[in-house]
A protein has these predicted regions:
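Low-complexity acidic/polar repeat-biased segments
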Residues: 35-38, 104-144
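Low-complexity, Pro/Thr/Ser/Gly/Ala-rich linker/spacer regions in secreted
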Residues: 35, 43-62, 135-149, 403-415
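Hydrophobic single-pass membrane-insertion segments
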Residues: 23-34
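Acidic, glycine-rich calcium-binding repeat modules characteristic of RTX/beta-roll
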Residues: 36-96
Length: 415
């Protein structure tokens, strides 16, 4: 192998906040540096903060690392991989979806493991034997074989569950535009404590006696855009002191499913105060559990958060993590979760980024929500650099069940 053809994988130290100890991830691509040279791993003095399910903060001096191998980047040499320390090997672009397929192209070479990838490139893991690379250390592409589509909206139109505007028989659209935890016009259905927006729709009245004439939903070139922007002065007396208008869509009354894959393709807004999300809640209206397929803060659009919330042990816990990603405000990306009876896995642009065990209380049908919150303690309030409207552009939302493992699902709920 010619020295110039060898690519070595280099990582920069990064301090990350994650939601559960031992689930440390960041998105750090490999870089071509020409001729072979010694790889510098993350130093022992690079501290990392992690959160346990109980909320305690711990300092770790050896953060787990992800070694990313992408198609088209040539041969690679990786040093310092340690699965026992929760390091991961992420393989993108080679259509490798199962650990067995990766193990089939591994061979031991002395004290190293050589991975012969489809099309010719090889990856050498130095001082790592194949038996030291467990299935759990591999982050692969989403396996779409055996997936049966159970829900699809490409937003060529907007199917609104229009409560308050039509007789019951005409209200059977797909997307409900409030939480439904109070009456459709109640504050508890139109925002969450600490947030600064109201989730509006053309029927929304607030405390006024008639509709306020608001519509945060816009169809643009086959996408649904949810706009978050300052509330007009004329409606401020009627929206419980909130300062912004935005949108929420849910399948609470149209679709829920036990287990499966839930996916969205979207471009996210940039600017302090914006907080877009795609998530799942139980159809029986209990909480937790909850699966956050993604959450992003508008002032940190290169960081992606995922989490699974539970109260199975009596206390509210959250397991998941955050990771570095390309700027999510610049282009559309795919965000997905595969939720099964044993495990939950998150995917970004079709490649696994995180997994946790399925909590004991997460075995009942859940429905989908997508919303653009504005303001609050976590995203902060919009500032002088925030540009309005903030636009959460959704290309599609889809759901699948996996056969034959998943039980019958995709159940419908009456209005």
């Amino acid at each position: 192998m010619s020295p110039v053809a060898v690519r070595r994988v280099i990582f920069t130290a990064a301090a990350l906040i994650v939601l559960v100890a031992g689930a440390v991830v960041f998105y750090q691509p490999a870089r071509s540096v020409g001729a072979p040279r010694t790889i510098e791993g993350i130093g022992s003095t690079d501290a990392l903060n992690t959160f346990s399910p109980g909320g305690e903060v711990h300092a770790e001096t050896r953060p787990a690392r992800i070694f990313v191998v992408r198609k088209g980047e040539g041969d690679a040499v990786i040093e310092g991989f340690d699965a026992a320390n929760n390091d991961k090997l992420r393989i993108e672009g080679y259509s490798l979806t199962r650990p067995q397929a990766v193990k089939a192209i591994m061979r031991q070479a002395g004290r190293d493991t050589v991975l012969s990838l489809p099309g010719g490139p090889s990856v050498r893991l130095v001082n790592v034997t194949p038996d030291a690379i467990p299935d759990s250390s591999l982050q692969l592409e989403l396996d779409r074989t055996g997936l049966v589509e159970t829900f699809k909206d490409d937003f060529n139109s907007f199917s609104w569950y229009a409560e308050g505007l039509a007789p019951d028989k005409d209200r059977l659209g797909t997307w409900r535009t409030h939480y439904g935890w109070q009456a459709p016009g109640g504050e508890g259905s139109r925002s969450l404590p600490g947030e600064s927006e109201v989730y509006a729709d053309p029927a929304f009245k607030g405390t006024a006696g008639q509709a306020l004439g608001l519509n945060p939903f816009h169809l643009v070139d086959g996408t649904l855009e949810i706009w978050g922007e300052p509330a007009p002065e004329r409606i401020l007396p009627f929206i419980w002191g909130r300062r912004y208008v935005s949108g929420l869509i849910t399948t609470k009354y149209s679709f829920s499913q036990l287990y499966g894959v839930f996916e969205i393709r979207a471009r996210l807004p940039k600017g302090r105060g914006f907080w877009p999300a795609f998530w799942l809640l139980p159809a029986d209206s209990t909480w937790p559990p909850e699966i956050d397929v993604f959450e992003v803060l508008g002032h940190e659009t290169t960081k992606l958060y995922v989490a699974a919330h539970s109260k199975a042990g009596g206390d509210h816990t959250a397991a998941g993590g955050d990771m570095r990603v390309p700027d999510l405000s610049e282009d559309f990306h795919r965000y997905a979760v595969e939720w099964g009876p044993e495990e939950i896995r998150w995917y970004f642009d079709g490649v696994e980024i995180e997994r946790v065990a399925t909590p004991a209380d997460m075995h009942k049908p859940m429905y989908m929500l997508a919303n653009l919150a504005v303001g609050g303690g976590w995203p902060g309030q919009p500032d002088g650099f925030t540009t309005f409207p903030g636009v959460y552009a959704i290309d599609f939302i889809r759901a699948y069940r996996r056969e034959p493992k998943d039980p019958p699902s995709g159940e419908k709920h009456p209005s």
